């Protein structure tokens, strides 16, 4: 036989080298949908322990962005890995469908409700718009390879969910946590509605900063508090504020009880007067007022000035000095202008003193008609007029432009105000909600752990939750209030259940269509229907009850995990915690995981104006979803997640390494039937047994990393295994045995068995991350199997067997280190053109006694490990002058070009080539593999 190529076991597979993911993935998605893959997974886990990841609903408005992709991919990785661990892990995606952004979009199309269109018609348009947005986002999420119940997602606008939201509110009421009050809330004058804490963003703004004097009603009496008797000049208390427009609502001056205050006298423009200022701020204040010299007449504690009265600077009444813990000396005068209708601290301290909660400002930010001086003016435009009036009254001591951080509406990006309005609140303290919530935070696992202290601080400091909104498209607060007493109907809880039953059939419009007499009968005239809607954060925050507790696939099991971006500590995590604790006395989750925001390669937020936005649709169309998924998994999500074209291209390079490894495995399993060809691990060649043992240990590490949500560690370990243990060592060594050994011989079948075990394990390792590629690999693996890898559990065939005669893992690591040193010297010889390929080389290893014993243990098989035609081991002391030192102190090397003939079939240079009459171009080993029983390998 002259052409020996046909006697080789050449690799062959249908698995292409190039993934062509952008084109192949959509085809696979079609098959997944056609085969009902998600339901197959569900069926495979019937009766197993549930693991419930509850999807925080994205808002049904606009296209998905890279942050959405990160979130959904992380969730998908967890659900798939938990399924692989044997859990029943359903994934029901959801959408947040009510609220202002949708209203604004619909207004642009059909106008405001009550103008060209009725409120009922407007709600129907909102429902249609939200449904369209859901459909668009759903397709994009599916394209990412995220498996879930996409045909039956939960929508907060589902009639059943709307009804359950109402039911959850009834439980909050039943527990005594709801109250109505006039309180200052974040108010957007553009929205015409209250805002939740989560709807407020802080941006820099320039405001007028003014110092204002409030003259004492009885200056002599006030001076006496400082130990000054018979004082004849005017005494004033000075406040500093950046919101002059709130001065019409001023009802007090707040001081710190333990702070020292000074009475400071000076003369300016021929007038002698005395000011009360915090002692530590006297110098900075008087510098602002251009006072060159002064006298401190006396000092006293703030507590001594309690209830002393001062004239309002332009209104005809006096205001008291009161004491509050919120007063600091960080800026200003140490005395705080207090308007209970326009500030949370002001409101709280005002309640202690029974102050009027004055609110002269309407919904649109314009002063009401009965506001003296400023009626009909918008508050921000009125600032200059307030300053002018103060100057006219002689009360203005200083006025400058001041740049500071100020709350803005997250939708309109415009400054908001604090404004007292009648609203519905969930009380933080009336029935111990704050205390219980803090206890529940301690019982929850926060990932990363800094999430715990973050949400604790928020709960400790948050005000009562204003849950009412004055909007059209939202779940109604289905309450009846007594027209005279403003009290809730005594049967509110049972009435809400009857309303919920109607909403379940007809949607939220059922509330607005309801005639009160249908439920209240003769009492109807005594009560009015509440027209407010719920804060959308209540909608999403109650889904642990309105969705999870209601859908059968969750089996009534509590939620194990919430996973969202780090902004949700004050958003969904907070609202869910508040509602669940109010309803059930416990948190709705056992674990809360947060991921960072996506930034570009320079650490900047994604912005259309900067032009650094990376759209997930662009990535999937160009590189494929698996590349995006690999980037997400490989990135440490605990901080900001950096993404750019360059970074994604690096992910594509890493992907190619994994794909090439998978291709090598599949190609070399050609013709292998595990049912009859599988060699038991204990009967394998030692190197094969080692790699199976190594894979078994790695699998435990990978499963542990998945369980701890450390996906970047999963990818690191996977890449290390593919690149080092496999790529640079095992796969390189076994090529010779795989290609040249007898096809049915033990040496080759042992190797194929190891490759089979690795492939079976690896396809499962990558399935949660590289879902499309895993499916592609799964379809080409030999042996009978289920239709999809996603219904499987972690591979159980990786037996970690160590025989008494086996070489230790440390031995193989040492051999790997030796091989690396040999490769370096061979590479230099190639560069020097002393040899071509490594099989042209004969290597002499000069080693110390310990290393010599290790190297000679595997005898002639050492050459197969080193990929050389000959390998001799001699004592280190015998090293010749030409021997090259290595990074191993125990090893020196000499590489020479072999003088033996090259075997035509295996390319090894062997002395016997040319001596075998029947096969003059072959070595003895190849003849044995062609005509005999096949070579015997013990070690490698």
From Swiss-Prot:
Reactions that this protein is recorded to catalyse: tRNA(Ile) + L-isoleucine + ATP = L-isoleucyl-tRNA(Ile) + AMP + diphosphate
Keywords (A to Z) from UniProt: Aminoacyl-tRNA synthetase, ATP-binding, Cytoplasm, Ligase, Metal-binding, Nucleotide-binding, Protein biosynthesis, Zinc
GO molecular function: aminoacyl-tRNA deacylase activity; ATP binding; isoleucine-tRNA ligase activity; tRNA binding; zinc ion binding
InterPro entries: aa-tRNA-synth_I_CS, aa-tRNA-synth_Ia, Anticodon_Ile_BEm, Ile-tRNA-ligase, Ile-tRNA-ligase_type1, Ile-tRNA_ligase, M/V/L/I-tRNA-synth_anticd-bd, Rossmann-like_a/b/a_fold
Motif 'KMSKS' region in this chain: 605-609
Gene3D superfamilies given in the database record: 1.10.730.20, HUPs (3.40.50.620)
Cellular location(s): Cytoplasm
CDD domains (UniProt xref): Anticodon_Ia_Ile_BEm, IleRS_core
Top-rank taxon, per record: Bacteria
Locus of motif 'HIGH' region: 58-68
Entry's cofactor comment: Binds 1 zinc ion per subunit.
Binding site for Zn(2+): 903, 906, 923, 926
Residues that coordinate or bind L-isoleucyl-5'-AMP: 564
GO CC annotation: cytosol
EC number: 6.1.1.5
Disulphides: none
Binding site for ATP: 608
GO biological process: isoleucyl-tRNA aminoacylation
Quaternary data: Monomer.
Function, in words: Catalyzes the attachment of isoleucine to tRNA(Ile). As IleRS can inadvertently accommodate and process structurally similar amino acids such as valine, to avoid such errors it has two additional distinct tRNA(Ile)-dependent editing activities. One activity is designated as 'pretransfer' editing and involves the hydrolysis of activated Val-AMP. The other activity is designated 'posttransfer' editing and involves deacylation of mischarged Val-tRNA(Ile).
Entry's family note: Belongs to the class-I aminoacyl-tRNA synthetase family. IleS type 1 subfamily.
Entry text on domains: IleRS has two distinct active sites: one for aminoacylation and one for editing. The misactivated valine is translocated from the active site to the editing site, which sterically excludes the correctly activated isoleucine. The single editing site contains two valyl binding pockets, one specific for each substrate (Val-AMP or Val-tRNA(Ile)).
Name recorded for this polypeptide: Isoleucine--tRNA ligase
Organism whose genome encodes this protein: Shewanella putrefaciens (strain CN-32 / ATCC BAA-453)
Record lineage: Bacteria, Pseudomonadati, Pseudomonadota, Gammaproteobacteria, Alteromonadales
């Amino acid at each position: 036989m002259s052409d020996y190529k046909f006697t080789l076991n050449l690799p062959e597979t249908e698995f292409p080298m190039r993934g062509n993911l952008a084109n192949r993935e959509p085809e696979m998605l079609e098959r997944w949908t056609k085969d009902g893959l998600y339901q197959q997974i569900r069926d495979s886990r019937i009766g197993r322990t549930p693991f419930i990841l509850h999807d925080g609903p994205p808002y049904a408005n606009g296209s998905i962005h890279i942050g959405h992709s990160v979130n959904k991919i992380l969730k998908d990785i967890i659900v798939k890995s938990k399924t692989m661990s044997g859990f029943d892990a359903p994934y029901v995606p959801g959408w947040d469908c009510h609220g202002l952004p949708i209203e604004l979009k619909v207004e642009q199309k059909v106008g405001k409700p009550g103008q060209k269109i009725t409120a009922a018609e407007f709600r129907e348009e909102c429902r249609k718009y939200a449904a369209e947005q859901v459909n668009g986002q759903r397709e994009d999420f599916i394209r990412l390879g995220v498996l879930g119940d996409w045909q039956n997602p939960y929508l907060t606008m589902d009639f059943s969910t709307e009804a359950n939201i109402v039911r959850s509110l009834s439980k909050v009421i039943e527990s005594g946590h709801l109250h109505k009050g006039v309180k200052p809330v974040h108010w957007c004058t553009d929205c015409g509605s209250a805002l939740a804490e989560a709807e407020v963003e802080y941006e820099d703004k320039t405001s007028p900063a003014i110092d204002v004097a409030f003259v004492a009603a009885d200056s002599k009496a006030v001076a006496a508090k400082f130990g000054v008797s018979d004082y004849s000049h005017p005494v004033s208390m000075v406040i500093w504020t950046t919101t002059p427009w709130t001065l019409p609502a001023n009802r007090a001056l707040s001081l710190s009880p333990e702070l020292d205050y000074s009475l400071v006298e000076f003369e300016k423009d021929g007038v002698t007067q005395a000011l009360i200022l915090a002692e530590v701020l006297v110098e900075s204040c008087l510098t602002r007022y251009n006072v060159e010299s002064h006298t401190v007449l006396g000092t006293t504690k703030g507590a001594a000035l309690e209830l002393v009265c001062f004239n309002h600077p332009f209104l005809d009444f006096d205001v008291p000095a009161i004491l509050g813990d919120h007063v600091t000396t960080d800026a200003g005068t140490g005395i705080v202008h207090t308007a209970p209708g326009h500030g949370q601290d002001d409101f709280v301290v005002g309640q202690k003193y029974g102050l009027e909660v004055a609110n002269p400002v309407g919904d649109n930010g314009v002063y009401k008609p009965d506001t003296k001086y400023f009626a009909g003016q918008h508050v921000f435009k009125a600032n200059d007029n307030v300053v002018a009036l103060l100057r006219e009254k002689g009360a203005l001591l200083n006025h400058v432009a001041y740049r500071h951080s100020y709350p803005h509406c997250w939708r309109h990006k415009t400054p908001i105000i604090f404004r007292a309005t009648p609203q519905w609140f969930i009380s933080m303290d009336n029935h111990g909600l704050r205390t219980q919530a803090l206890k529940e935070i301690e019982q929850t696992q926060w990932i990363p752990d800094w999430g715990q202290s973050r949400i604790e601080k928020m709960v400790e400091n948050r005000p009562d939750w204003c849950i009412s909104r004055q909007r059209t498209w939202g779940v109604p607060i289905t309450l009846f209030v007594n027209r005279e007493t403003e009290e809730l109907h005594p049967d509110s809880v049972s009435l809400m259940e009857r309303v919920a039953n109607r909403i379940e059939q007809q949607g939220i419009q059922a509330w607005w269509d309801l005639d009160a007499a249908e439920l209240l009968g003769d009492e109807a005239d005594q009560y009015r229907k509440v027209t407010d809607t719920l804060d959308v954060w209540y909608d999403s925050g109650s889904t642990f009850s309105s969705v999870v507790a209601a859908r059968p696939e969750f089996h009534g099991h509590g939620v194990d995990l919430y996973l969202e971006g780090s902004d949700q500590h004050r958003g969904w995590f907070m609202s869910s915690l508040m509602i669940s604790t109010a309803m059930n006395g416990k948190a709705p989750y056992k674990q809360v995981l947060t991921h960072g925001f996506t930034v570009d390669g320079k650490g900047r937020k994604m912005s259309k104006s900067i032009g650094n936005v990376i759209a997930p649709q662009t990535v999937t169309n160009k590189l494929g979803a698996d590349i995006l998924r690999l980037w997400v998994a490989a990135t440490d999500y605990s901080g900001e997640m950096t993404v750019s074209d360059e970074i994604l291209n690096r992910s594509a390079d890493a992907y190619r390494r994994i794909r090439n490894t998978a291709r090598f495995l599949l190609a070399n399993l050609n013709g292998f039937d595990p049912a009859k060809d599988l060699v038991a691990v204990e009967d394998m060649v030692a190197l094969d047994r080692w790699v199976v043992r190594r894979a078994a240990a790695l699998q435990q590490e990978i499963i542990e990393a998945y369980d701890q949500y450390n996906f970047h560690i999963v990818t690191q370990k996977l890449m290390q295994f593919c690149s080092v243990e496999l790529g640079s060592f095992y796969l390189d060594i076994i090529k010779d045995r795989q290609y040249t050994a007898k096809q049915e011989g033990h040496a080759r079948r042992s190797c194929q068995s190891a490759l089979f075990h690795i492939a079976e394990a690896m396809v499962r390792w990558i399935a949660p991350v590289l879902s499309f590629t895993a499916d592609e690999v799964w379809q080409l693996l030999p042996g009978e199997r289920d239709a999809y890898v996603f219904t499987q559990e972690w591979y159980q065939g990786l037996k970690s067997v160590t025989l008494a005669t086996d070489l230790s893992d440390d031995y193989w690591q040492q051999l790997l280190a030796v091989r690396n040193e040999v490769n370096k010297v061979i590479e230099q010889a190639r560069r020097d053109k002393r040899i071509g390929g490594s099989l042209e080389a004969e290597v002499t290893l000069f080693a110390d006694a310990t290393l010599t014993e290790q190297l000679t243990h595997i005898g002639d098989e050492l050459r197969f490990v080193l990929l050389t035609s000959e390998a001799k081991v001699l004592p280190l002391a015998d090293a010749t002058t030409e021997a090259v030192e290595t990074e191993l102190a125990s090893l020196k090397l000499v590489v020479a070009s072999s003088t033996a003939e090259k075997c035509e079939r295996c390319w090894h240079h062997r002395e016997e080539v040319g001596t075998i009459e029947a096969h003059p171009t072959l070595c003895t080993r190849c003849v044995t593999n062609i005509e005999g029983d096949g070579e015997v390998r013990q070690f490698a």
